[in-house]
Amino acid sequence: MGPAFASAALALSEALNLPSSGEADFVLQVGTEGLQLQELGPHAPGPLSVDFVRGPLAHRRLQGGGSGQMIAKAVGIQPGVRPDVLDATAGLGRDAFVLAQLGCNVRLIERHPVIAALLADGLQRARLDPDVRPIIERMHLQTGDAIQLMNAWEGDPPQVIYVDPMFPHREKSSLVKKEMSMLRPLVGDDLDASSLLEAALKLATHRVVVKRPRKAPSVLGPKVGYVLEGKSSRFDIYPKRSLKP
């Protein structure tokens, strides 16, 4: 590790209050590919990082379905309407990036400091790419507990709040399997999803959207207004007001 990377690793260790050496099941490593989360062990998968410039997100950016994508319909994107969105469970930022690419201003909240650090690193590196920078400039990350932050919200509230809780059963793609196998031991399941929904419904001015596995029950709370369903997942939509141009 070069001096610059060693210095960055030490600073990150201090910021996250993590040991810089010793026994561990996971390590954060800093290098030419940015910040990576690596599981240790003989059968561990490869490192996990956030990359908005290359890989699946680049393909989706260049070849994706535009405003016809189900997530776009779920948050209310339509001609002349690009709602202000709060992604209350940002994770690795994939869905927020899609919405920002489509023109939405997206505020992201991620409560786990390691996941937030991976996301912040991905955003920082993506700003160096001239094609992706305009998208990233519409994404604004905050680390903290979404329920607390929403309950103490100051300023203009978001029109739409998007929630994607981590539940025991998720999509079966190889990418998601890898991500879940690494993230679940760190963050666990979102056992406070109903409280998250309650806070979101109080704050959002127009609608709340909850992403769920297609066959999973709805989050405990108010009745779902309507559902958009795909092959492996669905969006439960709780409308409050119509989004209009």
UniProtKB/Swiss-Prot annotation:
Q: What is its EC number?
A: 2.1.1.242
Q: Which domain of life is it from?
A: Bacteria
What is the enzyme's class at the highest EC level?
transferase
- Is this entry keyworded rRNA processing? yes
An example of a GO molecular function for this protein is: rRNA (guanine-N2-)-methyltransferase activity
Residues that hold S-adenosyl-L-methionine according to the record? 94-95, 110-111, 164
Q: Which SUPFAM superfamilies match?
A: S-adenosyl-L-methionine-dependent methyltransferases
Q: What is any Pfam family matched here?
A: SAM_MT
Q: Which UniProt keywords apply?
A: Cytoplasm, Methyltransferase, rRNA processing, S-adenosyl-L-methionine, Transferase
Position of the signal peptide = none
Identify the Gene3D superfamilies for this entry.
Vaccinia Virus protein VP39
Main localization, broad class: cytoplasm
Family classification:
Belongs to the methyltransferase superfamily. RsmJ family.
Question: HAMAP family, per this entry?
Answer: 16SrRNA_methyltr_J (MF_01523)
Query: Per its record, how is this protein called by name?
Result: Ribosomal RNA small subunit methyltransferase J
Tell me which species this is from.
Dechloromonas aromatica (strain RCB)
Q: Per UniProt, what is the name of the gene that codes for the protein in this document? A: rsmJ
